[in-house]
C-alpha cells in the first residue's frame, strides 16, 4: 500500500481478490535472473524469465527457498509471461488448496505457473539477476493490473521467502522469493500462502533454508498481508519487514515489516519501485553474497538502476526508503500504506522501539527490551523502547522526572514508572554514561545523542533497521560504551549493522571489502538504524559511539556526520514531528542514504584529509532541519567524525562486525564474517568494557565523577526513600546513574566551552536534567505537602518547607530507608539497630549515623520543630527530618500517607512518647503511636503516618523501634 501511495498510481487495486487478478489480464513483469531486463516485462518476456520451480519446495521449509532456488528460478525463466499470467489467473481458484500443487508447480513449471507458481518464475529471475534489474522487473510485475490480485496472495509467499531467506541469502530470497514466489506464492498465499511461499521457490526454499527461523517467523505476518494484492510489491514489503524483524527481534519484527511492504507494494510499477527499494534495502542488509546483491540489485532496479541499493532506495522509495531503512520503513509503510497490516508491523517494531534498536538484543531486553535500550535502544526501547521517546531532551526530562524510579527500579514504587521510564532511563543512563565516560567532547556528543539520538534511534527502531539496531545496539551499545579506547569502532559497528541490513548484499560486500567502503556503508546503514527505532538507545548509542570516539573525535565525528546527515533527513521528513517512531520520511531517508554514501565516498577519498567539509553540509542540513539537537550535535563533531572515520574505518568496521553479528540473525553472520576480519580485537574488548559501563548505573555514576557528588547526594536522598527496600548495592548503582544527570548538568557548562555545537545540545540536555532534578524536588515537596494536608498537623507542612531546605543534609540518609532508620536508631539508642534490621538495613548503622549526625546538626537550627528535637534529641529529630525527605522522593511511588518532614522531626518526640509503645504489631504500634503523638501534636501523627507509607512493609516497625529507642 505504501508503495502505491508513493508511486501515486496503482494500475490494479492493491487489494485485489484472486478472482480480480484472474479477471484482469495478468501483466506481471517477470524479471529474469538478469537484471538488465526492462523494468516492465510483458507476458511475452515472462517466457524468457519463467523459472521452473524445483520440486524441493517444502511447505514447512520457507528457508529452503533460497539463493539456490533463485538459480533454479533463473534457469526456469523460460516460460512465457503469458503462461505465468494464465497460471496466475488459474491460481486464485487453486490457491486455497494448492500447497501440494505448489510443490507440483515447482516440479511442473507450466502447470505450476497456471496454478499460481507463475509468480515464482518472476521472483527467481529477479533474485538471480542484479538487484537493480530485478527491482526493475519487479516494478514491471507490479505494474500489471492482473498482478494485483496475485499480489494480494503474494505477501505471504514473500513473507515466507523473507523468512526463508537467510542473512546472506535473505536479500536474494527477497528478490527471488518476491519475484518468483510472488506470483505462484500469492495464489497459494491466499489459502496456504506460507506454504506457497515455500513452494514458490523450491529454489527459494533452498535459499530460505539458509535462514529458516527468521523468515519462517515472517511467514505468519505475511499471511496477514495476502489480502493486499500487491504481488510483487507485497513481496518486496514482506522482505523488508522480515529483515527488520530479524534485526530487531531476531526475525519477528523485521519479517513483519517486509511483509507489510509487500502489501504496500501491490501498487503499480511506481509502487514496485518503492517496494523494490524496500526489498533491496533489506536485501542489502541481509544479503552477504552476490545473490543477495543481485536480489538487492533487482529491487534497486525496480526502484532505479542504481548500482547502490541505498541510493536507489532513497530515490525511488524515499518515503519507503526511510521506512525500509529502519523498522520505520515497515512502520512507515503501514502508516503510509492504506493496508492496516502495515501498521501492526510498525506497532510491533515500536513496541521494541522504545527500542530503539540497541535495545532489541540486549538493550531491548533492557529497553528493556526498551525494548526495552528497545528501546529502545530500547530501544531500548527496546523498546522499544521504547512508545517512542519524543526526543532526547524529552526522554531525558521524562527520565529525570522519573529519576527516582530509575534510580530505584527494584522498588515497587519505581516499577510503575520503570516500564516507560525504565526504557527511557536505560537509554538515558547509557547516553549519559557515554557522555560522562568520554571526554567532554565525547560527552557533548553523547548529550546530543541523548536528545537527538533518542529521537533518531527511535526512528531507526521504527525503521527496518530498528530491529537490527536494537539487537545491534543492545549488544553494540554496551559494546560502544565498553570501548572507550576505540569508540569509533563501535560507532562504525552500529553503522555497519544498519548498513548491513540496509545495504544490499553486494553493496554490503563491496563496502565490507574495503574498510573505508564498509565504513561508509555502515555509516549509511547506521544512520537509518540510529534514526529508527530506539531513538533513545539506538541514536543515543550512535551518538555515544561518536562520543566514545570522542577521544578519536575526528574519526568519530566523521562517521557521525555522515550518519547524522542521513538521520537528520529522516528525522526531518518523518522523525521531525515524531520522536522517531514512525516519522521516517522515505525521501529524507533516501537523502540520508545518498548523503551517507556520498559522505562515505568523501571519507574514503578524504579519509586522511578532512572530508567533514562535504559531510558537514548534509549533517548540518539534516541535523539542523531534522533535529535542532542533532544539528548542533552533528555540526561540531562533523569534522571530528570525518577524521575519526578516516582514522579508523577499520576499527569501526571491526566493531561493526562484532555488533552486527549478534544484531542480525543472518546478515550478521555473513556481514560479521566479512567484518570479522576487519574487526579489531581492541574494538571488541573495548566494546565489552563499554557495555558494562553503559549497563551499570555505577559506571554512569563513575563517569559522572566529582560533578555528580553534590547532586548525587541530593538525588540519593530523594530516591533512597523509595529504594528503602532495595539492596544497598542496587541503590548505590542506581544512585550513581541518577547522579549522572547531575554531572551532566555540571559538565554542560564545561562542555559548552569545549564544543560550541556539541555543547549546545549537551548544555540543553544538562539543563533539562537540572530542570528534571528540580522537578523531582518539587514532586517530592509537593507530595510532602499533599501528605501534610492529609495529615492533621500543619507543622508538618512547615516542616516540609524546612525539610526541603535541609534536604541537602539528608542526602547521606538517602542511601535507603533502612539506612535512615539505622542512623536514627544509632542516634536514639543502640536498640534501634536490631529493630532497624527488620526493614532490611543493609548498611552499617554507624556509618549512616555519622553522616546523619553531621547533616542533622546542620539542619537542626532551621528545623521548625527544633523544640521537639530538643525534647528528644536534636540529631534524632533531624534524622527524622531527613527521613521525611526520603519519603518525599518515595511518595510519588507509594502515594500512601506520606507526611512532610515536619512529622519526621516530630518523630523524635513521638519516639520518646512512644517508648512505652514497644514493638508489638507494627500496625498497632503505628496506630497507637499516632494517637498518642497526635494528641501531643498533629505533626507527630503525620510523622508516624508518613513513615508508614514510606516503608509500607517495615516502616511502622521502624517507627516503633525508633519510639522504643527514644
Swiss-Prot record:
Biased-composition ranges, Basic and acidic residues, are 542-555, 597-607, 957-966
Q: Where expressed (tissue)? A: Expressed in cardiomyoctes. Expression is highly reduced in hypertrophic cardiomyocytes.
**GO MF entries:** lamin binding; transcription corepressor activity
Give the matching InterPro entries: MLIP (IPR029331)
List the Pfam families hit by this protein, alphabetically: MLIP (PF15274)
Q: What superkingdom heads the lineage?
A: Eukaryota
Q: Please list the residue ranges that the record marks as compositionally biased, kind Low complexity.
A: 354-387, 437-455, 478-497, 785-797, 825-834
Biological process (GO) annotations?
negative regulation of cardiac muscle hypertrophy; negative regulation of cardiac muscle hypertrophy in response to stress; negative regulation of transcription by RNA polymerase II; positive regulation of transcription by RNA polymerase II; transcription by RNA polymerase II
Q: Name one GO cellular component term.
A: PML body
**Compositional bias per record (Polar residues), positions renumbered to this chain:** 195-207, 325-337, 507-521, 639-649, 657-684, 798-810, 937-946
The record's subcellular location field reads: Nucleus; Nucleus envelope; Nucleus, PML body; Cytoplasm, Cytosol
**Segment Required for interaction with ISL1: which positions?**
144-810
- According to the record, the residues making up region (Disordered) are 132-154, 182-207, 303-337, 354-388, 434-562, 597-684, 785-837, 929-966
Q: Which UniProt keywords apply?
A: Cell membrane, Cytoplasm, Membrane, Nucleus, Phosphoprotein
Q: Which residues does the record list as Phosphoserine (modified residue)?
A: 129, 486, 791
Q: How does it sit in the membrane?
A: Peripheral membrane protein
State how it assembles.
Directly interacts with LMNA. Interacts with ISL1 (via N-terminal domain); the interaction represses ISL1 transactivator activity. Interactions of ISL1 with MLIP1 and GCN5/KAT2A may be mutually exclusive.
Described by its record, this protein's role is as follows:
Required for myoblast differentiation into myotubes, possibly acting as a transcriptional regulator of the myogenic program. Required for cardiac adaptation to stress through integrated regulation of the AKT/mTOR pathways and FOXO1. Regulates cardiac homeostasis and plays a role in the protection against cardiac hypertrophy. Binds chromatin. May act as a transcriptional cofactor for ISL1, repressing its transcriptional activity. May also repress MYOCD transcriptional activity.
Write down what this protein is called. Muscular LMNA-interacting protein
Amino acid at each position: 500500500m505504501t508503495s502505491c501511495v508513493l508511486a501515486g498510481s496503482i494500475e490494479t487495486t492493491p487489494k485485489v481478490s484472486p478472482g480480480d487478478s484472474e479477471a484482469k489480464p495478468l501483466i506481471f513483469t517477470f524479471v529474469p535472473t538478469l537484471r538488465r531486463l526492462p523494468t516492465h516485462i510483458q507476458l511475452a518476456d515472462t517466457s524468457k524469465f519463467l523459472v521452473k520451480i524445483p520440486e524441493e519446495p517444502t511447505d514447512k521449509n520457507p528457508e529452503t527457498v533460497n539463493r539456490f532456488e533463485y538459480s533454479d528460478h533463473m534457469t526456469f525463466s523460460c516460460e512465457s509471461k503469458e503462461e505465468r499470467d494464465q497460471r496466475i489467473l488459474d491460481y486464485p481458484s487453486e490457491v486455497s488448496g494448492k500447497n501440494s500443487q505448489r510443490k507440483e508447480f515447482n516440479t511442473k513449471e507450466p502447470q505450476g505457473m497456471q496454478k499460481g507458481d507463475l509468480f515464482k518464475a518472476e521472483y527467481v529471475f529477479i533474485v538471480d539477476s542484479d538487484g537493480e534489474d530485478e527491482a526493475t522487473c519487479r516494478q514491471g510485475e507490479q505494474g500489471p493490473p492482473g498482478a494485483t490480485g496475485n499480489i494480494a496472495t503474494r505477501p505471504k509467499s514473500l513473507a515466507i521467502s523473507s523468512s526463508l531467506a537467510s542473512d546472506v541469502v535473505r536479500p536474494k530470497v527477497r528478490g527471488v522469493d518476491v519475484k518468483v514466489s510472488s506470483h505462484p506464492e500469492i495464489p497459494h498465499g491466499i489459502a496456504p500462502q506460507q506454504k506457497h511461499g515455500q513452494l514458490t521457490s523450491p529454489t527459494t526454499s533452498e535459499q530460505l533454508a539458509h535462514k529458516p527461523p527468521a523468515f519462517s517467523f515472517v511467514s505468519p505476518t505475511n499471511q496477514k498481508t495476502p489480502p493486499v494484492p500487491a504481488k510483487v510489491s507485497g513481496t518486496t514489503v514482506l522482505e523488508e519487514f522480515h529483515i527488520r524483524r530479524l534485526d530487531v527481534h531476531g526475525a519477528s519484527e523485521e519479517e513483519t515489516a517486509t511483509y507489510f511492504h509487500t502489501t504496500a507494494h501491490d501498487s503499480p510499477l511506481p509502487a514496485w519501485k518503492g517496494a523494490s527499494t524496500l526489498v533491496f534495502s533489506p536485501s542489502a542488509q541481509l544479503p552477504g553474497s552476490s545473490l543477495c546483491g543481485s536480489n538487492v540489485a533487482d529491487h534497486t532496479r525496480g526502484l532505479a538502476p542504481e548500482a547502490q541499493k541505498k541510493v536507489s532506495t532513497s530515490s525511488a522509495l524515499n518515503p519507503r526508503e526511510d521506512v525500509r531503512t529502519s523498522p520505520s520503513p515497515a512502520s512507515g509503510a503501514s502508516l503510509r500504506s492504506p493496508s492496516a497490516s502495515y501498521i501492526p508491523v510498525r506497532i510491533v517494531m515500536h513496541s521494541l522501539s522504545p527500542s530503539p534498536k540497541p535495545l532489541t538484543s540486549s538493550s531491548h531486553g533492557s529497553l528493556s527490551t526498551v525494548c526495552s535500550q528497545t528501546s529502545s535502544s530500547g530501544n531500548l526501547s527496546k523498546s522499544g523502547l521504547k512508545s517512542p521517546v519524543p526526543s532526547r531532551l524529552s526522554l531525558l526530562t521524562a527520565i529525570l522526572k522519573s529519576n527516582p524510579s530509575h534510580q530505584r527500579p527494584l522498588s515497587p514504587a519505581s516499577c510503575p514508572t520503570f516500564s516507560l521510564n525504565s526504557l527511557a532511563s536505560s537509554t538515558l543512563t547509557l547516553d549519559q554514561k557515554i557522555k560522562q565516560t568520554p571526554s567532554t567532547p565525547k560527552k557533548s556528543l553523547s548529550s546530543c545523542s541523548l536528545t537527538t539520538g533518542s529521537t533518531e534511534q527511535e526512528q531507526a527502531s521504527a525503521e527496518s533497521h530498528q530491529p537490527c539496531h536494537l539487537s545491534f545496539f543492545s549488544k553494540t551499545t554496551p559494546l560502544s560504551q565498553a570501548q572507550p579506547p576505540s569508540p569509533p569502532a563501535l560507532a562504525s559497528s552500529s553503522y555497519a549493522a544498519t548498513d548491513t541490513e540496509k545495504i544490499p548484499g553486494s553493496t554490503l560486500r563491496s563496502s565490507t571489502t574495503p574498510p573505508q567502503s564498509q565504513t561508509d556503508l555502515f555509516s549509511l546503514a547506521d544512520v537509518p538504524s540510529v534514526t529508527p527505532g530506539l531513538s533513545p538507545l539506538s541514536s543515543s548509542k550512535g551518538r555515544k559511539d561518536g562520543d566514545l570516539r570522542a577521544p578519536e573525535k575526528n574519526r568519530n565525528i566523521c562517521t557521525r556526520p555522515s550518519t547524522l546527515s542521513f538521520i537528520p533527513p529522516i528525522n526531518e521528513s518523518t522523525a521531525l514531528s515524531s520522536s522517531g517512531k514512525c516519522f521516517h520520511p522515505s525521501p529524507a531517508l533516501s537523502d540520508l542514504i545518498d548523503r551517507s554514501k556520498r559522505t562515505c565516498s568523501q571519507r574514503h577519498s578524504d579519509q586522511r584529509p578532512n572530508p567533514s567539509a562535504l559531510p558537514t553540509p548534509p549533517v548540518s542540513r539534516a541535523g539542523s532541519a531534522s533535529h535542532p539537537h542533532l544539528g548542533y550535535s552533528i555540526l561540531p563533531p562533523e569534522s571530528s567524525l570525518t577524521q575519526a572515520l578516516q582514522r579508523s574505518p577499520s576499527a569501526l568496521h571491526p566493531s561493526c562486525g562484532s555488533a552486527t553479528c549478534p544484531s542480525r540473525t543472518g546478515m550478521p553472520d555473513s556481514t560479521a564474517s566479512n567484518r570479522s576480519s576487519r574487526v579489531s580485537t581492541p574494538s571488541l574488548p573495548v566494546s565489552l568494557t563499554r557495555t558494562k559501563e553503559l549497563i551499570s548505573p555505577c559506571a554512569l555514576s563513575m563517569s559522572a565523577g566529582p560533578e555528580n557528588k553534590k547532586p548525587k547526594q541530593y538525588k540519593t536522598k530523594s530516591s533512597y526513600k523509595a529504594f528503602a527496600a532495595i539492596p544497598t548495592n542496587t541503590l548505590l548503582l542506581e544512585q550513581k546513574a541518577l547522579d549522572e544527570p547531575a554531572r551532566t548538568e555540571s559538565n554542560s557548562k564545561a562542555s559548552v566551552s569545549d564544543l560550541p555545537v556539541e555543547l549546545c545540545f549537551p548544555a540543553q540536555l544538562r539543563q533539562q536534567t537540572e530542570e528534571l532534578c528540580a522537578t523531582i524536588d518539587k514532586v517530592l515537596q509537593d507530595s510532602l505537602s499533599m501528605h501534610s494536608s492529609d495529615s492533621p498537623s500543619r507543622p508538618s507542612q512547615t516542616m516540609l518547607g524546612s525539610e526541603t531546605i535541609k534536604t541537602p543534609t539528608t542526602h547521606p540518609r538517602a542511601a535507603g530507608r533502612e539506612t535512615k532508620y539505622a542512623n536514627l536508631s544509632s542516634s536514639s539508642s543502640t536498640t534501634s539497630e536490631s529493630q532497624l534490621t527488620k526493614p532490611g538495613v543493609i548498611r552499617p548503622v554507624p556509618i549512616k549515623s555519622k553522616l546523619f549526625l553531621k547533616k542533622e546538626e546542620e539542619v537542626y537550627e532551621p528545623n521548625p520543630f527544633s523544640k521537639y528535637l530538643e525534647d528528644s534529641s536534636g540529631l534524632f529529630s533531624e534524622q527524622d527530618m531527613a527521613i521525611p525527605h526520603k519519603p518525599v522522593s518515595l511518595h510519588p511511588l507509594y502515594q500512601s500517607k506520606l507526611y512532610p518532614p515536619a512529622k519526621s522531626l516530630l518523630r523524635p518526640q513521638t519516639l520518646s512518647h512512644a517508648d512505652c509503645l514497644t514493638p508489638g504489631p507494627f500496625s498497632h504500634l503505628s496506630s497507637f503511636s499516632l494517637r498518642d503523638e497526635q494528641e501531643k501534636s498533629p505533626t507527630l501523627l503525620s510523622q508516624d503516618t508518613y513513615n508508614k507509607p514510606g516503608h509500607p512493609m517495615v516502616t511502622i516497625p521502624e517507627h516503633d523501634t525508633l519510639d522504643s529507642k527514644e
